[in-house]
């Protein structure tokens, strides 16, 4: 069912900023091609308390932003609905959002979005539907008629579940999605306020350790390697600060290369802005950190959104992407 523009704008504003080997050496910044410094040197960046925000913290701690002439302040977003007002009034420059959220914002007209860098792509084990061990639900088909907790409606969780349930002949309107914050989902399951919950890491591992079991991995099959989230700014901001945007992209690219090759680098920073301990970061399931920005990959998200009625019309993701300098 396709929702109206006003409703979709509200959904976009409240959408969740989601979601997520050893020893690679950083090759350093690319030589040449830089004329003048960044137009704006002090940036406020909105991050979510999930592993996919790690590259910004890596870039900051390793001095990559400093080398690009940038000083970065991070703001952990606990209430997703506060993000777009900050972006639109200029108190936040760049933010991380799920691609479902970013495409929704673009389609709703709430803002024109430019994607600066990919953040995380899906991998098996990082998100899925869980039930308590004693639940009568034994497989995805059993979710028909179930009440499922999600962190946000019309976002990554509901869309990825819809793609999987379709294969089991369960339509989205045959389940009931209810909003429960990730932190409260396990309690909702234990108290039987919901039948199942869609969780992401690190909540997924914690729930399984506390007596829940995985019923459906939502990062396989139709959503295998699906792009999850990325760093974005408004079209207006990017047009006014092209050198700043490019500097941010270069710094994050270097951090992404470290994140994809060395789990220990991630373990250094994730505990700084989440409640996940270092040893858990070393062992938990993790998505992949793309080192390129590919519109074709992200288009998969927009196409799934259109298929399941999240969009009024198809969105061309290529028009939203800002090529990474040097690529």
Give the location of each predicted region:
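Bacterial signal peptide processing site
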Residues: 23-26
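Conserved C-terminal helix/tail region of periplasmic/extracytoplasmic solute-binding proteins
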Residues: 305-327
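Pocket-lining segment of extracytoplasmic ligand-binding domains
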Residues: 100, 109, 178, 183-269
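Short, glycine-/small- and polar/acidic-enriched structural segments
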Residues: 28-170, 179, 195-198, 214-217, ...
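Bacterial N-terminal signal peptides that target proteins for export
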Residues: 1-11
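Short, solvent-exposed loop/beta-turn-alpha elements that line the ligand-binding surface or hinge
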Residues: 67, 121-122, 220-224, 288-296, ...
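C-terminal motif of bacterial Sec signal peptides marking the signal peptidase cleavage site
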Residues: 18-21
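Secondary-structure end/capping motifs
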Residues: 238-312
């Amino acid at each position: 069912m396709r929702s109206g523009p006003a409703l979709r704008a509200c959904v976009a504003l409240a959408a969740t900023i989601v979601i997520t080997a050893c020893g690679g050496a950083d090759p350093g910044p690319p030589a040449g091609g830089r004329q003048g410094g960044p137009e704006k040197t002090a940036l406020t960046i909105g991050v979510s308390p999930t592993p996919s925000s790690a590259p910004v913290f890596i870039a900051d701690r390793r001095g990559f932003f400093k080398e690009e002439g940038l000083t970065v302040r991070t703001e952990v977003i606990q209430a997703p609905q506060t993000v777009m007002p900050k972006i639109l009034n200029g108190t936040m420059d760049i933010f991380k959002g799920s691609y479902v959220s970013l495409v929704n914002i673009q389609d709703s007209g709430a803002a024109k979005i430019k994607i600066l860098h990919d953040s995380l792509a899906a991998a098996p084990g990082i998100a899925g539907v869980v039930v308590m061990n004693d639940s009568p639900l034994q497989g995805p088909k059993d979710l028909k008629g179930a009440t499922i907790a999600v962190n946000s409606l019309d976002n990554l969780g509901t869309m990825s579940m819809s793609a999987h349930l379709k294969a089991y002949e369960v339509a989205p309107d045959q389940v009931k999605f209810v909003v429960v914050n990730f932190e409260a989902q396990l309690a909702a399951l234990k108290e039987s306020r919901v039948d199942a919950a869609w969780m992401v890491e690190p909540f997924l591992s914690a729930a399984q350790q506390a007596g829940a079991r995985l019923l459906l991995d939502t990062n396989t099959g139709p959503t295998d390697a699906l792009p999850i989230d990325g760093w974005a700014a408004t079209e207006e901001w990017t047009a006014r600060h092209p050198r700043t945007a490019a500097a941010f992209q270069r710094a994050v690219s270097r951090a992404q290369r470290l994140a994809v090759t060395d789990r220990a680098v991630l373990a250094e920073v994730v505990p700084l802005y989440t409640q996940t301990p270092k040893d858990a970061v070393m062992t938990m399931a993790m998505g992949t950190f793309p080192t390129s920005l590919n519109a074709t990959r992200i288009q998969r998200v927009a196409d799934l959104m259109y298929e399941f009625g999240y969009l009024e019309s198809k969105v061309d993701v290529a028009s939203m992407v800002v090529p990474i300098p040097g690529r």
